[in-house]
């Protein structure tokens, strides 16, 4: 491999996207090869500059490529279409067409891994798990396929309420060594599983490690901040979450990543919980305008943003209805753990019917059991039960829920 391309690829692997772009352009000037073109396109795409990447990729004639070359070109082309150009249907159709053209088993496994990642982001984690499981069980899957499949499986498992395999899957994704943002996909799975297991200190510690490991001014740093803010919101550290989310949202806004809409969703939730009604409304509007098929995995978070914004506007029934819709959206997508978190918020907002929903979900683990106890106590107007739930949530560091449950206990006593 020419020295210039190797240097650009190393910068890409290190997450230094600006340097990768500069080195990639220099390499392309010296050697108009497919390798140079692909390295430059990836550096541009990972900065959120999808149109620029598309121009670089469009210069390639796929009919003139061998199967390995076709794969090397098709994967970043599809990824760019899905995220950066916001054309998920086109990207999925393109990948399926490419899948029909390749003949080798390793190539098929790699395409299936990316199709699974697309399915996850499009709100179909169960389909994503089917594809990921096939890839991870295949002796033909290369490290790139394993990285994509394992990272997607880690996040899907966590959001679906299956926590036991999350760390192992994240480890497989890391060991695959594929560059990019996969560490944050699997990391979100890990922090989600830790929160749902009541280990909020470990969740926050991991999120901070991911932030610290990423270079500032890069999308990876902003995504790490997003994961940290999600844990802070679960803790009830809303004041601390807002500046983190504001920085992440601004950094991710120019990109096409699915993380971008999630940043606005979480920021709207946080601002609403602080009573900043106007600001929350503006952030909710941004979240709604940016949300689409490529971020459908996070539809429950958008509904929760509506719930908390309604609560800030003193629309109690609207808040409860939106929180219920968050839980229903999560359940429809098989995201049971996300549904439980939504229903905890529903109880905080005054929903007396959440207990039967939580019971139906059957999510095992610390938070699943605590959520059911809390919802049952609220439905029954059981002051002692609410006080016990407040103490239990406080003990694991979910202070926001603890404060609300304590207030509900006081109200149940007639205080």
What are these regions (language model features)?
Residues 1-2, 415:
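Accessible peptide chain termini
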Residues 2-231, 243:
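Internal alpha-solenoid helical repeat scaffolds
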Residues 64-67, 169, 190-415:
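Helix-coil-helix junctions within alpha-helical repeat/solenoid scaffolds
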